């Protein structure tokens, strides 16, 4: 997989970069740019593309492997999990995380869960 033509993410200074790299790779999988079994860009290539230290990319890849999103073939590199449900699993987790983030922010604004639910329902109709 080549990184050519991809839009480089803008990093949020309030979040660890390795977590943002993990999310970038997950979005590539969810969008179908990386498919189950595809080779993930090398640590070096990803670091050059993103303009970050290779150790940061390595940490992100290690965490992605720990959670089962990618796996390593010794001497060949990193690959997207061959689990056919990986895209759905990643998408579901990312959606839940986003909903939880905004739910917390809305509650901090004083909205109840019922009010949040009604607003969301209203927006989707």
Q: Where are the regions a protein language model picked out?
A:
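Extreme N-terminal segment that seeds HTH/winged-HTH DNA-binding domains in transcriptional regulators
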Residues: 1-39, 93, 97-123
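Beta-hairpin "wing" of winged helix-turn-helix
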Residues: 33-38, 66-75, 79-82
């Amino acid at each position: 997989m080549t990184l050519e033509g991809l839009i480089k993410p803008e990093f949020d200074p309030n979040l660890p970069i390795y977590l943002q790299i993990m999310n970038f790779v997950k979005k590539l999988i969810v969008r179908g740019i990386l498919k189950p079994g595809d080779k993930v860009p090398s640590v070096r290539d990803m670091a050059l593309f993103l303009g970050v230290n290779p150790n940061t990319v390595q940490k992100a890849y290690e965490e992605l492997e720990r959670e089962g999103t990618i796996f390593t073939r010794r001497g060949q590199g990193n690959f997207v999990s061959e689990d056919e449900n990986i895209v759905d699993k990643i998408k579901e987790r990312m959606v839940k995380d986003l909903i939880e983030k905004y739910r917390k922010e809305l509650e901090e604004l004083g909205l109840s869960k019922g009010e949040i639910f009604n607003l969301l329902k209203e927006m989707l109709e």
